[in-house]
Amino acid sequence: MKKLKPLFAILTAALILFSAVCFLYPAISNAINEQYNESRIDDYNNNVDSISQEDIDDYFSAAEKYNKALATDVSTDDSKLSILSHYDEILDLDDGVMGYVEIPSINVRLPIYHGESEDVLTKGAAHLEHTSFPIGGESTHVCISAHCGYPTQKFFDDIDELENGDEIYIYVLDRTLKYTVTGTDVVEPDDSSKLEVVQGKDLLTLVTCTPYGVNSHRLLVHAERAPFEAATSDSAATVSQVTRTVPKSHQLQIIIAGLAVIAVVIVKV
């Protein structure tokens, strides 16, 4: 009987530890994916730092042409169709990321990818094709979509908590764009009337599924461009640092340390 006690203790500890891992799986998975997103954003910033100002200007020029073509009323113009057909090449630094979005009030920081494929939506935020590229300017309407209720990571789960006046930051190349929330809408999935360009306006809309777990409609969070002084790489880093109550790069280490403590306590008991 005494020989069984150590085995019983080990099995009990293993069972409790396994239960703890299952309970913490969403947090662990989220921390891993957030760390991956941080590395993608770091890689993007390093890529931007490595290219010349001339190349940066060329990237913006191509995006501006796309946005102007998108804002024109003639949908069958050959030159417009030609420009729009090069969507995947615009703001493409060969790493798949065109920039990143940051929402301080709900602690969101995600890379932005081209298009709304399922592969993209499992990694970060998606820029909706046939909407303006996120470079700012009059008569532009940027639309960025992300999952809600995804099992392995939080994306736009909390954008329903955003209030008028909350700030959203978009980082593209060497530009930092600041938008403030102006309102929300709930629409049918095929209703794009709220995503159209408004002449003279510089707009941003965040898109996700709603209600949570049902996903029968789309939640739209609208925002409008606001002044942001000294939008340099240094100021962008400062904004990024203050948005996170716990740095995402440390979340996984905290969880692992917690599991280790649980295991030690159980084994000693």
Task: Give the residues covered by each predicted segment.
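C-terminal single-pass membrane-anchor helix
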Residues: 239-269
